[in-house]
From Swiss-Prot:
InterPro entries, per the entry: IFT43 (IPR029302)
Family annotation (Pfam families): IFT43
UniProt GO BP: cilium assembly; intraciliary retrograde transport
GO cellular component, one term: intraciliary transport particle A
Gene behind the chain: ift43b
Keywords linked to the UniProt accession: Cilium biogenesis/degradation
Superkingdom, natural source: Eukaryota
Record function comment: Component of IFT complex A (IFT-A) involved in retrograde ciliary transport along microtubules from the ciliary tip to the base.
Region Disordered, residue ranges: 1-107
Subunit note: Component of IFT complex A.
Protein's UniProt name: Intraflagellar transport protein 43 homolog B
Family: Belongs to the IFT43 family.
Record's keyword annotation contains Manganese: no
């Protein structure tokens, strides 16, 4: 047996020499695992016999997204003081003194605006064309000033007519208030004078016709 073990050891040594450092490390790791396995088996058997629970689970290593989620969870548990400070910073800041009553704009009512507009508006004067009638005076002035008016259409001469025209003072009659008694007497007197003249003319005619017969 000793020879066999020695031969085996010599063979192992040769193999180790052949394998190099990496081979030695692998061999040592294999021996350690082979030695630890019976120990674990013994411990598990003893723990089951004693009635103890299963061994504790090893702590899991977290990486990648897990770290970010954990960080966000921690940030969610920040104190309320920090959150209040951040909320105040994020709020829109209004200038001081803007809440005063003098800064509030006053919107006028619609009725007041309409009344002001009506007061400011000025009615335009009506544009009506009136045909102005010329008076006698205007006609006289035109007749005296413009000699071209004395000829109508350049052919008819109106000089004879202009010479005979009477002035305005002679043609215009004054406005006199009528009285019934005065008007009756004037009309009756004129009629009587006309009748008298008619009778006298008739008598003269009769006398003329009767004179030759008498001769």
């Amino acid at each position: 047996m000793d020879d066999h073990l020695k031969l085996g050891d010599s063979g192992v040594v040769k193999n180790v020499a052949r394998l190099g450092r990496r081979g030695q490390r692998a061999r040592q790791a294999a021996e350690q695992t082979s030695l630890e396995e019976p120990r674990h088996v013994r411990k598990s058997s003893s723990s089951t016999s004693m009635g103890e629970g299963p061994p504790p689970k090893p702590a899991r290593r977290q990486g990648g997204w897990a770290e970010e989620t954990s960080g966000s969870a921690k940030s969610g548990r920040r104190p309320a003081m920090v959150q209040d400070v951040e909320d105040r910073r994020l709020r829109p800041q209004t200038p001081q003194g803007s809440d005063g009553e003098g800064d509030i704009p006053v919107i006028p009512d619609l009725d007041e605006v309409q009344e002001e507009d009506l007061n400011m508006q000025v009615a335009a004067p009506p544009s009506i064309q009136v045909n102005r009638v010329m008076t006698y005076r205007d006609l006289d002035n035109d007749l005296m000033k413009y000699s071209a008016f004395r000829t109508l259409d350049g052919e008819i001469d109106l000089k004879l007519l202009t010479k005979v025209l009477a002035p305005e003072q002679e043609v215009r009659e004054e406005d006199v208030g009528w009285d019934w008694d005065h008007l009756f007497t004037e009309v009756s007197s004129e009629l009587l004078t006309e009748w008298d003249q008619g009778e006298k003319e008739e008598q003269v005619c009769v006398m003329r016709t009767s004179l030759p017969k008498m001769g």
